[in-house]
Amino acid sequence: MTLTPLARAVQTHKAIGHPVRLRILLMLREGPLCGCQIGAVVKLAPSTVSEHLSELKKAGLVVEKKDGRWVEYRLVADPETEGRLSAISPGSERDATVLADAVLVKALRRVPLEELCGVDLDLTRLDRPAIVSALGKAEKLLAAG
C-alpha cells in the first residue's frame, strides 16, 4: 500500500519519536550495525531491539541485509533521511547518551559478532580491554551529562 505524503510523514515522525529508535538512527549514521551490536549499546533484549528496528524499517528509514546468522542494519541511503535526522537532532553530537553510544559502538565494531552475540548483553563478560575501557568512558560521559 502506498502512503500519502501526510501518512508517510506521520509514520516517520512516530518512528523517530521514540528515544531508543532515535539513538539507533544516530548510531547507524556512522555505518551499518548488527542487531546484537545495537542491543548491546541500548541494553535491551533482542526481541525489543527487533521491534524498534521493525518500526524504523516500516517508516522507510532503515534497511536490513541478512548475512548468514547475522542481520545487518543500515540507514536508507537518501538525502531525505539524512535531512530528517539533521533536522530533528541538532546538537545531538554533544548529548551524553549519544556520545556514550558512539564510544561503545566504536569499540564493539572491533569485536567478532560470534563473540559479542554470545554474551547476552553483558559486555563485562567480554574479556577485552578495549570494551572495559569503552564501558568506563561511556559511564563517565553519562555521569557528566
Where are these regions (language model features)?
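Amphipathic alpha-helical dimerization/coiled-coil segments
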Residues: 1-3, 79-145
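N-terminal helix-turn-helix DNA-binding core of bacterial DNA-binding proteins
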Residues: 4-48, 70-80
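Short alpha-helical segments used as structural interaction elements across diverse proteins
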Residues: 11, 18-20, 54, 66, ...
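Residue-level detection of the helix-turn-helix DNA-binding "recognition helix"
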Residues: 40, 54-58
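Residue-level recognition of hydrophobic positions within alpha-helical transmembrane segments
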Residues: 47-48, 60, 97
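Beta-hairpin "wing" of winged helix-turn-helix
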Residues: 57-67, 74-76
